[in-house]
């Protein structure tokens, strides 16, 4: 196993522990708590994949971070912060919408890259809106936290989420996943639109009414249902 992979996991575990202690003091805002929950799932998945114990990794990560801090000067810290572009966290969904339980009568699932797409293909003739929580950098989507499809009644009928065991995805990965989700939902004559926030940062080629316009390859796929569950 690559040593950088192990040390990266160890540092991530310790930094999550620090953030959790911060949240336990009721100091974190909604986006902070949202990321904390998502990162916890990601760390559990990575730990399982790597065969590493999270508690042991957290202790090792603490030693690594302490060593770095001992060697870090205030001036170097200022230069590092100034050189890193700041990302913004955008929320379409409330905490209730993020944590809302849902089940599928006709479950379908597809994995594309490091993203998992799930939907209920029993849903028919509904008006559906896609909402997402994600970070933005340079006016483009940086990291998808969670995307969900809601009916007008507020029911969750679809979802795109990062796979904990496969961290990392691009803006194009997210766009492709959105296309697959919309294609599956439209199969049963549902009307699907994308939130204004998603249109602006993740789906730039959209019509004014919020219904996305697909590239030719994606349009051909629209006539097919989503692939069988994996």
UniProtKB/Swiss-Prot annotation:
Pfam families hit by this protein: Flu_NS1
InterPro entries from the UniProt entry: NS1, NS1A, NS1A_effect_dom-like_sf, uS15_NS1_RNA-bd_sf
UniProt superkingdom: Viruses
Transmembrane regions listed in the UniProt entry: none
GO MF terms, alphabetically ordered: protein serine/threonine kinase inhibitor activity; RNA binding
Function, as annotated: Inhibits post-transcriptional processing of cellular pre-mRNA, by binding and inhibiting two cellular proteins that are required for the 3'-end processing of cellular pre-mRNAs: the 30 kDa cleavage and polyadenylation specificity factor/CPSF4 and the poly(A)-binding protein 2/PABPN1. In turn, unprocessed 3' end pre-mRNAs accumulate in the host nucleus and are no longer exported to the cytoplasm. Cellular protein synthesis is thereby shut off very early after virus infection.
Stated name of the protein: Non-structural protein 1
This protein's encoding gene: NS
